[in-house]
Design a protein with these regions (language model features):
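Structured, active/binding-site neighborhoods that engage oxygen-rich ligands
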Residues: 1-445
């Protein structure tokens, strides 16, 4: 059994996810609808729901389905027997790039937090009515937060927490990144991804979200429950925390892709893993001098060629080559995916598309990339954090304008049980040190 109470919404989400994967749902569809509308409070009904989820995890693929998507891509198992070494011959100084990545990540989280779970149309209207279009400074986000929090009846304490300038606030993305650093520093190659997940739960209360997207509850703590049982096996919760693996394996995209895949494999399958591999490889390549379209094209080598993710990323590249503007590109994503649907809003594929669009159309300009990510909808915080981290890694700390900084920009709050504040420059330095160390690793066990 699971460590989570299954709801009717979970069952319906599992059915919709199965459709997205091209599975033949004819044998279970009626049962799912019937059970999802019933009372699931009893242990008997929970067991029935569990068995139904288990049945859905074993459904066959419809004949004629156009994609070929292994649950775990080749070389991406939970234990990696051989990690590709890639090109580790880079001699450029990565220290400023690592600080740029961490700072960008924190700025992205801070700016996007005011628009979390707000529909794109509503967010754009709020920005324009407040004369904050485009978002051009951290002060803009403070003003926006004030309006959003006031209109939503949010407490004064929350508004003050967003506006305070002595540190970057704790968030599960930065906490997960800090936990990843600690695990690799302490254990080197001798750790399992499930240990990282448990380390997060024990030491960083926000590193794994305490809601239905906590996929560890669905699968990671029970060897008898496969990740494929989770309705959220392709959600963006692992995608948004994959950048750190690309930073640790900077200049080595194959290794970054495999590290990210291994980390997410306890809870995600198929495109939930491919997006992690893809984003980590982008982050690993971000310090190199190349155009974003070229970098995106190279990143396709790290995901299955005949997957939904590869298909949509190739479409995004084609849109750019045809001189389609940013707004039209984002609009097309919203035509394909319904942001009002929670499964779609946090699904890894549309969010990977938004990340790719924000990066490609920005041309490595930090301000442009941030604005594109934060105003494109879906998982706004995760996407903006990822985009700003990748662009920050490419540009370096010195290229991030002062208008995005807070007075205590080197202070990062955490939800760690041992320390509630860390130095951003120290986190960047630790990441840089691991880049050097991991070049000597051949295995994760």
């Amino acid at each position: 059994m699971l460590n989570i109470t299954i709801s009717g919404a979970d069952l319906e989400a599992a059915l919709e996810q199965s459709k997205l994967e091209g599975l033949d749902i004819s044998a279970v569809e009626a049962d799912v609808h019937k059970l999802s509308e019933s009372n699931l409070d009893s242990s008997a009904s929970q067991n029935e729901a569990f068995q139904l989820l288990l049945s859905m995890s074993k459904l066959p693929v419809n004949s004629g389905y156009q994609y070929d998507e292994p649950a775990v891509p080749e070389g991406g198992s939970v234990i990696l027997d051989s990690i590709a070494t890639g090109d580790t011959g880079s001699t450029h100084d990565l220290s400023d790039h690592m600080e740029g990545a961490w700072l960008g990540m924190c700025i992205g989280i801070r700016v996007a937090s005011a628009l979390r779970n707000i529909p794109r149309k509503t967010a754009i209207e709020a920005l324009k009515s407040a004369s904050l279009w485009p978002i051009s400074s951290l002060n803009n986000s403070f003003e926006l937060a004030s309006q959003v929090y006031t209109s939503n009846g949010t407490t004064t304490d929350m508004l003050e927490m967003h506006q305070q300038s002595q540190c970057w606030g704790a968030h599960r993305i930065t906490d997960h990144a800090l936990a990843a650093l600690s695990m690799v520093e302490q254990n080197g190659e001798e750790f399992l991804p499930v240990e990282l997940a448990k380390f997060c739960k024990s030491n960083f209360t926000s590193a794994i979200p305490a809601n239905s997207f906590d996929n560890l509850l669905w699968s990671g703590e029970n060897d008898n429950v496969p990740p494929s049982i989770s309705p959220y096996r392709e959600d963006s919760s692992a995608l948004s925390t994959s950048v750190i693996w690309g930073l640790i394996a900077a200049d080595n995209p194959p290794r970054a892709a495999q590290l990210a895949t291994a980390n997410a494999a306890i809870s995600h399958t198929k495109n939930g893993l491919y997006t992690c591999s893809w984003l980590a490889s982008l982050a690993a390549s971000s310090c190199e001098e190349m155009t974003v379209p070229d970098m995106i094209t190279e990143s396709l080598a790290h995901i299955p060629a005949n997957s939904r993710l590869a298909d949509v990323l190739e479409s995004v590249l084609e849109w750019y080559s045809l001189d389609i503007d940013l707004e039209t590109a984002v609009y097309r994503v919203h035509e394909l995916w319904n942001e009002a649907n929670a499964l779609h809003r946090y699904h890894s594929i549309p969010n990977a598309m938004i990340i790719a669009i924000a990066l490609i159309w920005s041309g490595w300009q930090f301000d442009t990339a941030l604005h594109a990510a934060v105003t494109s909808g879906f998982d706004v915080v995760g996407n903006t954090a990822a985009v700003c981290a990748v662009v920050g890694a490419h540009c370096g700390r010195e290229e991030i304008g002062e208008q995005w900084l807070i007075s205590g920009y080197d202070n990062l709050s955490t939800a760690s049980g041992s320390s509630n504040m860390v130095s951003l420059s120290d986190a960047a330095g630790r990441t840089y040190n691991l880049v050097q160390t991991l070049r000597n690793y051949a295995q994760i066990r």
